[in-house]
Amino acid sequence: MNKNIFFTAMAALMLSACGNQTKQQPETVGKNTASTEPELIFVRGPKASDKLFTGTAYVNELVPKSDSTAYAIGDVVFEPGCRNNWHTHQVRQIILVTEGKGWYQERGKEAVPLKKGDVYIIPAGMEHWHGATKDSRFVHIVVTDYQDDSCVIWGNPVTDEEYNTL
């Protein structure tokens, strides 16, 4: 069932990305992005900012936002115990889990466990965080929609007290 959701979401994304395009030449964005680490699909990106993540994370910008797109696609690797800060997207975000176990939590609600194969759509304006469980690496592809040139408002870190209650 999760594979069907994953492939349906990817097909819908590809169709929506192609739907408003005029005739253009194909563009290769991610040459040599395949990972040599057998459990990872894409090569690790650079280490993420300590100001936005607690713990170690790597962000690989697979498809950057451009003048012709209203979204960006990234691959994020969270090492065990790592999580990003509370944040809000002005437009929705889609999480496609490709490895491991993680958490997604909206402010004031119970955390939702995420695992390989899960697809999660985060509505616009929802303050939330996501990251790895204490004992598992967590990897996801994120499709982040933009409103003009902005996509996220960053908040405070998820405290150890908040995280350790999971």
Protein language model features and the residues they cover:
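Positively charged n-region of N-terminal signal peptides that target proteins for export
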Residues: 1-4
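C-terminal motif of bacterial Sec signal peptides marking the signal peptidase cleavage site
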Residues: 16-17
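A short, N-terminal "cap"/entry segment at the start of jelly-roll beta-barrel domains
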Residues: 21-70, 153-166
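Short, conserved beta-strand element in jelly-roll/cupin
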Residues: 75-79, 89-104, 143-145
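Short acidic-glycine-tyrosine-enriched beta hairpin
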Residues: 108-125
